[in-house]
């Protein structure tokens, strides 16, 4: 047991305005989390003894317990994602079961559950605000889904399943991370990497230096290729060496599918336990459990996926035909038998020839500082907010991390956020994400203020600046920053003071991508894009004809790209509805079966993409991957409100932006998302704008 002295100085246990990211270390985790859980356990017992079906005697003390745990656990989990060390990983792994045990105990508290039911059944129910009613109903539903209504022996079985699932998903993502790190290909002959742009060669040389090849340079090598996205993608897009593309593709596709890092058995066990959990709760399959907290139903999700699939199939077949004839014209020996490691490469060549756009040549026009300035400028126009640097106000975990304050039109702070832009392959996980640090809350307000302001963190994995050259971005990375900022806006601009339903909390999962995907649409809006795209050396604006090509390129291979996402969504639903663990069909056979209708080029027999499908086995998207498409329908339709108003009519754009802010961004989880959408749009969502934006409308007509 840690001594009182060491506990009193443990940063995880202090009161703080902002998390002490700079002073938390692996050795703080075990004693800190254990002491915190002990403290929260005592508070929970106290609450259960004194609970009454009222806000002050139930919701407020409960929010304090939930908040403290989510803030502290969020802090160490965040550090694991951005500053991973074996020590931190081991410490978190050790205390994770204890934290899950406490969460289960909290989620299955009969006194709390009964008090919420009493509020639900009281004569005062109708006088509660909609947000408070949503909060109560969410707590009751969550309790039922966490096994509260089960008999003792069944509840014990349920809890074992939950513990085991937590462990398995944890192990799943570690295997993916380790398998990704494990692959290294050192290249000493420049001929082998012909076609790769200087930015990629620079990255490969940096990777080589970090592995002990001190003299490596972009020009002379050696170059180290890894499976991290900033390394993998350029190889698939630009390497003329077909054998290299094949080797890297096969390695990427078979990550975590063999040896000690094989995720196959883990996936089977996860699916088996999820099905058992569903049956215990009285559902037929796990997809029904997942949909219990979503806007959609299994049937509605299936229906949407099929509608989009049938609109995408013929265009996707045409895409492959176009690629084949283009490759043939270029004299490619493989033209008639294009396969997986050729598609990205030849698509990139076709895109360059058709739209004369080379992603790499566009990079100088998208420097990170300019992109952020334009993004903040857009947020001011649409939502009337100012984003101002506040570096130094809060501790950070790396010197590259920026800190910002969001102010309303009167200049009052309304939120804060961290931004961690660059890739650090040895310690930071791939991808981009937004997470909450604090949610807006009346109950958690410091003395002297009426509400605690929300704080978010945005994390990306862009190419770091090299020398005096700023971080230069691909257009896709620009879209990613806009996307994550959309999530952050919904977290930060909430007007909801009930902490448990503020911001992104309690928003149905399939509606949560609406603001993020909505923001991506602005990257194609001429004035917005032109305010971003300034050459970092000359200041020259992106030429008009290039903008037109970018716009046209938006629908390039839309059928194929749509099918790819539909494949992920469909295989996810199949595995969580029809698949029987231990039955006649293996997970890979399910994948192959789904692919018949969703992949024009059938997958390789040895395709093991499921082994690194972290979204559904380690990331909360189980039987929920369809929600990306569901939200694309919502976001395209929301953006079409601005198109209807007139994108060049600044007054109309501001008015529509204000309406978007007052509904979709402000109401948080305090109102059902369909109601919120109808309040903004004046009607229910339609898939038509999405198909129109993707150039697939004619195909579906």
Swiss-Prot record:
In the UniProt record, does the keyword Transferase occur? Answer: no
Source species, domain of life: Eukaryota
Any single GO CC term annotated in Swiss-Prot or TrEMBL for this entry:
plasma membrane
Q: Where does Zn(2+) bind?
A: 483, 487, 513
Q: State where it is primarily located.
A: cytoplasm
Active-site feature positions: 484
Q: Which cofactor does it need?
A: Zn(2+)
Which residues does substrate bind? 615-621
Q: Which Pfam families match?
A: Peptidase_M3 (PF01432), TOP_N (PF19310)
PTM sites of type N-acetylalanine? 2
State the activity regulation. Inhibited by salicylic acid.
Gene3D superfamilies the record matches: Collagenase (Catalytic Domain), Endopeptidase. Chain P, domain 1, Neurolysin, domain 3
The catalysed reaction is: Hydrolysis of oligopeptides, with broad specificity. Gly or Ala commonly occur as P1 or P1' residues, but more distant residues are also important, as is shown by the fact that Z-Gly-Pro-Gly-|-Gly-Pro-Ala is cleaved, but not Z-(Gly)(5)
Physiological role: Oligopeptidase that may be involved in the degradation of proteasome-generated peptides. Binds salicylic acid.
What is expression of this protein induced or repressed by?
A: Up-regulated by pathogen infection, elicitor treatment and flg22, a 22-amino acid sequence of the conserved N-terminal part of flagellin.
User: What does the record note as the disruption phenotype of the gene behind this chain?
Assistant: No effect on germination.
Regarding protein family, the annotation reads: Belongs to the peptidase M3 family.
- State how the cofactor is bound: Binds 1 zinc ion.
| Assigned keywords, A-Z | Acetylation, Coiled coil, Cytoplasm, Hydrolase, Metal-binding, Metalloprotease, Protease, Zinc
Q: So what EC number does this one have?
A: 3.4.24.70
Which GO biological process annotations does it have?
proteolysis
User: Recorded GO terms, molecular function?
Assistant: metal ion binding; metalloendopeptidase activity
What protein name does the entry list? Probable cytosolic oligopeptidase A
Q: Does the keyword Cell cycle apply?
A: no
């Amino acid at each position: 047991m840690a001594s009182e002295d060491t506990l009193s100085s443990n940063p995880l246990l202090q009161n703080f305005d902002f998390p002490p990211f700079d002073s938390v270390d692996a050795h703080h985790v075990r004693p800190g989390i254990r002491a915190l859980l002990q403290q929260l356990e005592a508070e929970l017992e106290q609450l259960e003894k004194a609970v009454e079906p009222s806000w002050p005697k139930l919701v407020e003390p409960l929010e304090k317990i939930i908040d403290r745990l989510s803030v502290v656990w969020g802090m160490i989990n965040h550090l694991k994602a951005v500053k991973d060390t074996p020590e931190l990983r081991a410490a978190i792994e050790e205390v994770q079961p204890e934290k899950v045990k406490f969460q289960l105990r909290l989620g299955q508290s009969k006194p709390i559950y009964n008090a919420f039911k009493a509020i639900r059944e009281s004569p005062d129910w109708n006088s509660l605000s909609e947000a408070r009613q949503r909060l109560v109903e969410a707590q009751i539903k969550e309790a039922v889904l966490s096994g509260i209504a089960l008999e003792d022996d069944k509840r014990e079985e349920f809890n074992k399943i939950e513990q085991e699932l937590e462990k398995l998903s944890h192990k799943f993502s570690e295997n993916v991370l380790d398998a990704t790190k494990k692959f290294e290909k050192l290249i000493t002959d420049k001929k082998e990497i012909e076609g790769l742009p200087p930015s990629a060669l620079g990255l490969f040389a940096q990777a080589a230096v970090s592995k002990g090849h001190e003299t490596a340079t972009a020009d002379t090598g050696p170059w180290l290729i890894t499976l991290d996205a900033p390394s993998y993608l350029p190889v698939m897009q630009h390497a003329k060496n077909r054998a290299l593309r094949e080797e890297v593709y096969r390695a990427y596709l078979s990550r975590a599918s063999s040896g000690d890092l094989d995720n196959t058995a883990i996936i089977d066990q996860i699916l088996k336990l999820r099905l058992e959990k569903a049956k215990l709760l009285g559902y037929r399959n796990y997809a029904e459990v997942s949909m219990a907290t979503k806007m959609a139903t299994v049937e509605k999700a299936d229906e949407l996926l099929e509608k989009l699939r049938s609109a995408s199939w013929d265009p996707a077949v045409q895409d492959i035909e176009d690629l084949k004839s283009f490759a043939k014209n270029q004299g490619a020996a493989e033209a008639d038998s294009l396969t997986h490691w050729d598609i990205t490469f030849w698509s990139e060549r076709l895109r360059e020839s058709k739209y004369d756009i080379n992603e790499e040549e566009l990079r100088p026009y998208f420097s990170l500082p300019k992109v952020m300035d334009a993004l903040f400028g857009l947020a001011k126009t649409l939502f009337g907010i100012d984003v101002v640097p506040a570096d130094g106000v809060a501790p950070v975990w790396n010197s590259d991390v920026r800190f910002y304050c969001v102010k309303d039109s009167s200049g009052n702070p309304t939120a804060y956020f961290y931004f961690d832009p660059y890739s650090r392959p040895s310690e930071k996980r791939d991808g981009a994400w937004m997470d909450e640090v604090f949610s807006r809350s009346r109950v958690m307000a410091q003395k002297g203020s009426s509400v605690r302001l929300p704080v978010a963190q945005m994390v990306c994995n862009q190419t770091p600046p090299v020398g005096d050259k700023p971080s230069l971005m691909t257009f896709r990375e620009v879209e990613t920053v806009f996307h994550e900022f959309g999530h952050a806006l919904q977290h930060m601009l909430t007007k909801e003071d009930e902490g448990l339903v503020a911001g992104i909390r309690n928003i149905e999962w399939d509606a949560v991508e609406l603001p993020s995907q909505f923001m991506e649409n602005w990257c194609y809006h001429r004035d917005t894009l032109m305010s971003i795209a300034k050459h970092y050396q000359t200041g020259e604006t992106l030429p008009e004809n290039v903008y037109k090509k970018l716009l046209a390129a938006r629908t390039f291979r839309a059928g194929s790209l749509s099918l790819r996402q539909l494949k992920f969504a469909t295989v996810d639903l199949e595995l969580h509805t029809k698949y029987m663990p231990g039955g006649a069909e293996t997970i890979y056979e399910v994948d192959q079966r789904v692919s018949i209708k969703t992949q024009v080029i059938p997958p390789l027999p040895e395709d093991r993409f499921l082994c690194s499908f972290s979204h559904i086995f380690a990331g909360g998207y189980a039987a929920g991957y369809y929600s990306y498409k569901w939200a694309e329908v919502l976001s395209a339709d929301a953006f079409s409100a601005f198109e209807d108003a007139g994108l060049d009519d600044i007054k109309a754009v501001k008015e529509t932006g204000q309406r978007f802010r007052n509904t979709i961004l402000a109401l948080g989880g305090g109102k059902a998302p369909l109601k919120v959408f109808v309040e903004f749009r004046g009607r229910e969502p339609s898939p038509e704008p999405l198909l129109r934006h993707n150039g697939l409308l004619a195909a579906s007509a």
